[in-house]
Swiss-Prot record:
UniProt KW Repeat keyword: no
Protein name: Guanylate kinase
Guanylate kinase-like domain segment(s): 2-180
Assigned EC number: 2.7.4.8
A family per Pfam: Guanylate_kin
Native source organism of the sequence: Parasynechococcus marenigrum (strain WH8102)
PROSITE patterns reported for this sequence: GUANYLATE_KINASE_1, GUANYLATE_KINASE_2
Task performed by this protein: Essential for recycling GMP and indirectly, cGMP.
Stated family: Belongs to the guanylate kinase family.
Length: 182
């Protein structure tokens, strides 16, 4: 039986970058592909970027228990299909879910043995600097991200471990150790 690891943390903390580095060094890790009701963006491919579903199909998956976790953001739904995760775990592979806080809480309820890791910034000020440094969000969007980040940071005590991402290489080594890969 494989192991299930959940990683969450606020926007701008470096989850995506850290997961990319983790996968480059550990190709045996399987990362779940999310389902969504939003329309595909240019270059996105079915089954690789997301599984694109109608709202009706997504709602049916929720009702059937076909999603490990799901949430709605900005009018679109996102979730983690249950069957592929269970198949990979049965095959003995390490499985990684990079999801939002509420999704991590949902997974905890259905997979109590999942290792839950919270990725934290070295400080709130550094997190704000990173979010502003992207240069992609309006001031209103930045304020929304920061408000949400405060809520998420207050929940880090719910997790099995907290990894502070102030040095990418050190954070990567700590994450590998927590996942039993180091």
């Amino acid at each position: 039986m494989g192991t299930l690891t959940v990683i969450t943390g606020p926007s701008g903390v470096g989850k995506g970058t850290l997961v990319q580095r983790l996968l480059a060094r550990n190709p045996s890790i399987w990362v779940s592909v999310s389902a969504t009701t939003r329309a595909p963006r240019e270059g996105e491919r079915e089954g690789e970027s997301y599984f694109f579903h109608s709202r009706e199909r997504f709602d049916a998956l929720v009702q059937e228990g076909g999603l490990l976790e799901w949430a709605e953001f900005a009018g679109n739904c996102y979730g983690t299909p249950r069957a592929p995760v269970e198949q990979q775990l049965q095959a003995g592979r390490p499985v990684l879910l990079e999801i939002e806080l509420e999704g991590a809480r949902q997974v905890r309820r259905s997979f109590s043995k999942a290792r839950q890791i919270f990725l934290a910034p070295p400080s709130f000020e550094e997190l704000e600097r990173r979010i502003r440094g992207r240069g992609t969000d309006s001031e209103d969007a930045i304020q929304q991200r920061l408000l949400r980040a405060r809520e998420e940071l207050s929940a880090q005590g719910e997790f099995d471990a907290v990894v502070v991402n102030d040095d990418l290489d050190q954070a990567l080594l700590k994450l590998e150790g927590l996942m039993g890969l180091g």
